[in-house]
């Protein structure tokens, strides 16, 4: 029942709207307008302090038949940069790309458009369906700020399982595991002295930092854990023993205990190096989001797999090395599976999206909304 031409036209329209993280207001207004044109009630949620945006989250509930568990759908309105002045084109090969030196914006306007098309299709064809709550978030790319802000208004959310439409890979891909993510920020303060005349009177912050890093387990720590140094910064004259070095690193793990062990290990290395050199250490650990892991035999996954198969699409489960709004929703106690929607080469000017994947994503949402074979959408 999906209108394929309308779906594509809406995608072309939406990606032309600038909505880099923090500047989603115009995109919020457009989606809100399109949903209200269907007679739907739309709630604005989240303040600028929590969402880090000049826009807001949008919540829209499409009431369905009683007695069937509701389904939550989620997609984010923001994009990464360069995402201003996007000119989408559909190639003869059926693949959508950006004409200019920008991203395409399929991440995540593919998911946004598919959700809006579901609302329109249910309006056009009022068949029995389960209650579906549409959640459009802001600030996902910059830190899942919009999704995290939902926690303050938890009562606005339906009680059910969720589908997040924000994974690379084809329709049929179900991300059921993703890591938690923590950032370690540190400043090492040494003591300046003349590098030629009084080198032993100084304490090199650079040398201290390098010794700490050399002692760290980095890269692929184990099958569930990774760690990386993003910044090791020190600027100064060559004739001065460097007194200040900045250190920023991350750790990710699908295991909560392993994530803590890795960040503890990294800070222990910093402490030991500073103790040895006599430098001072100031550090903080910021936990950006928690990981999640859904059992492969969960009834919700079996239901989703059945829907995909009924469409002639082969379902498969996967793990992700990055985070999404699914992390935030799972942390709130809402089981959320992140679905592949077809986007490839995301976060780059080579981003692509096959039109057939956009269409199949919208078709899947239609089937999920009207599917009443199980009650496994209940959490």
Spans of features found by a protein language model:
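N-terminal capping segment at the start of a domain
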Residues: 1-25, 287, 344-348
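Zn-dependent metallopeptidase/amidohydrolase metal-coordination segment
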Residues: 7, 232, 243, 313-375
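A short beta-alpha structural unit
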Residues: 12-16, 228-235, 250-254, 280-301, ...
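A non-catalytic alpha/beta surface segment that caps or lines the substrate-entry region
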Residues: 20-67
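Active-site metal-coordination/substrate-binding segment of hydrolases
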Residues: 54, 61-63, 67-136, 153, ...
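Glycine/charged-rich beta-loop-alpha catalytic/anionic-binding loops adjacent to active sites
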Residues: 90-103, 187-193, 311, 343-347
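Acidic/histidine-rich catalytic neighborhood of metal-dependent amide-processing enzymes
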Residues: 100-179, 221, 226-231, 237-239, ...
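Acidic-enriched catalytic cores of C-N bond-cleaving enzymes acting on peptides and small amides
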Residues: 198-233, 240, 257-280
């Amino acid at each position: 029942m999906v209108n394929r031409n309308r779906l594509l036209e809406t995608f072309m329209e939406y990606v032309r709207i600038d909505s880099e993280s923090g500047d989603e207001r115009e995109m919020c207004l457009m989606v809100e307008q399109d949903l209200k044109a269907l007679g739907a009630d739309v709630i604005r949620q989240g303040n600028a302090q929590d969402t880090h945006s000049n826009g807001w989250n949008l919540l829209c509930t499409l009431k369905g038949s009683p007695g069937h568990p509701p389904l939550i759908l989620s997609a984010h309105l923001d994009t990464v940069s360069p995402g201003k002045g996007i000119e989408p084109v559909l190639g003869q090969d059926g693949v959508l790309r950006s004409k200019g030196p920008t991203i395409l914006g399929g991440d995540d306007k593919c998911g946004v458009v598919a959700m809006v098309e579901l609302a329109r299709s249910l309006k056009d064809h009022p068949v029995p369906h389960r209650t579906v709550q549409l959640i459009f978030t802001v600030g996902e790319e910059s830190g899942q700020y919009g999704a995290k802000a939902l926690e303050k208004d938890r009562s606005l959310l339906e009680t059910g399982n969720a589908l997040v439409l924000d994974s690379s890979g084809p329709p049929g891909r179900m991300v059921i595991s993703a890591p938690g993510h923590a950032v370690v920020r540190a400043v090492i303060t040494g003591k300046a002295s003349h590098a030629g005349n009084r080198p032993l009177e100084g304490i090199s912050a650079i040398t201290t930092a390098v010794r700490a890093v050399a002692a760290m387990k980095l890269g692929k720590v184990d099958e569930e854990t990774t760690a990386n140094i993003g910044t090791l910064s020190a600027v100064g004259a060559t004739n001065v023993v460097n007194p200040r070095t900045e250190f920023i690193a991350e750790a990710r793990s699908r295991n909560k205990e392993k994530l803590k062990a890795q960040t503890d290990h990294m800070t222990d290395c910093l402490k030991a190096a500073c103790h040895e050199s006599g430098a001072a250490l100031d550090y903080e650990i910021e936990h950006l989001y928690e990981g999640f892991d859904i059992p492969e035999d969960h009834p919700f996954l079996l239901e989703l797999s059945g829907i995909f198969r009924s469409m002639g699409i082969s379902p498969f489960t996967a793990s992700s090395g990055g985070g999404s709004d699914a992390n935030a929703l799972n942390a709130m106690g809402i089981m959320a599976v992140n679905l592949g929607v077809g986007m490839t080469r995301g976060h780059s000017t080579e981003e692509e999206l096959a039109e057939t994947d956009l269409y199949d994503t919208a078709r899947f949402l239609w089937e999920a909304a009207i599917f009443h074979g199980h009650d496994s959408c209940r959490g």
